[in-house]
C-alpha cells in the first residue's frame, strides 16, 4: 500500500476512535464529560488538533468560523482550558501509536541501506512553561547567578526510522532523566513490534555504556555507538580493532566482543565508533556513511521545534504539554507520509537535463496537514482531500542544493525565547 493511502487509513482510524465512546472511556477523568454540557469530549479533542500557536481568543473564534459542522459553543478560554485537563494524555499517545502500528503493518516495502533498516535514537531538551503543575511533574531548577530564578524543562526522546522518515516511538520526561533509560524504552518497543531483526540502531555520544552495549548484544540489536574520545576503548583504538568486554561471575555476565573503529573526519579530527556489527560486507570506510545517517534525527527535532513550534505550548500544565507533544508526533508522521510519496513521484518525473534535483516542500505539507486533519475529523472534508494534498505537494517543490557544509559554531546560551504572554496574532 502506498503512503498516501496509509495516511488516509490513519486519519480514518483516528476519526473512528474519537467517535467511539467505548474507546474514549478509559481516557477521560472519572465523572467528567458524562452529563450533557456545552463542551463535549469530541469538541475538545478536535479543538486540540485544530488550535494554532495564536492566542486562545483567536483559536476559539476561528474554530467556530472554520468548523461549522462541529457546532463549537461560545465558551471562555478558561472553560476550555479547564475542560482539556479532564482528557488523559494517554488518548493522544494511543492515537500516535495507532499511526505507527498502521504504517508498519500496511507499508508494502521499506527502504534499506546495504540490506539493513536504520534507526536513530536521540534526545533533546524541551523548553516548558513555568507553572506549579510543570514544576511538580517535570521538576524545578534554578540558575546561576540568580538562584531565585526558577524554571523547568523537559527531555524529549525518540527512535526514528531514518530511511522511511517515521518516528517509531517518542516519550517526554523530566529534564534530568536518563537518556539511556529512555533509549531502553525505545528498544523494548522495537522488540515488541518485531522490527529489530535486520536493523541497525545508531546512537550519539553519551549513550554508550557497557551495560547499554550488553543489552543490545543480548537482545539481538545491531548497534553503532559513537564513543567519547577520553574513554579507554577510544584511546586504544587505531584503525579497526576487535576488543572484548570482560564478563564477571559476580554479575553473571559473559565476555562480549566489540568492534571499535577510528574514523577520520573531513576537518582533520577523528571519531570513534563501537559496534557489534561484524558483517564483512560492511567495511570500515562504510561506517562513516552509516553513522552520518544519524543526522536526519537532528533534522527531525529541527522540524518539530521550528515547523511545528513544539515548544510554543498553549497550556501550562503537565497534562496540556503531554497532549500537545503526542499530537505533534502524530502530525509529523502524517506529513512525512505525504512528503515521501511526493518525493518519489518528483524523482520519477525528473528529467536528466534538469540542473537541480527537487523535493516536496515539507513546510507546505505540514501547514496543510495541520489545517485539513481537524476538518476531516469533524466531517467537513472527505478523505479525498488527502489525495489532493499529495497532488499539490508534487507541484510545490524546493531545490535540493548539493554539497552544502557549514562549520559548527559554539553558540552562547540564550535566554528562554518562549513566553505564553507573547502569542502570534494568527
Located regions from the model:
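A short, well-structured juxtamembrane/interface segment
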Residues: 100-108
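Short Pro/Gly-enriched beta-strand edge/turn motifs at strand-loop
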Residues: 137-143
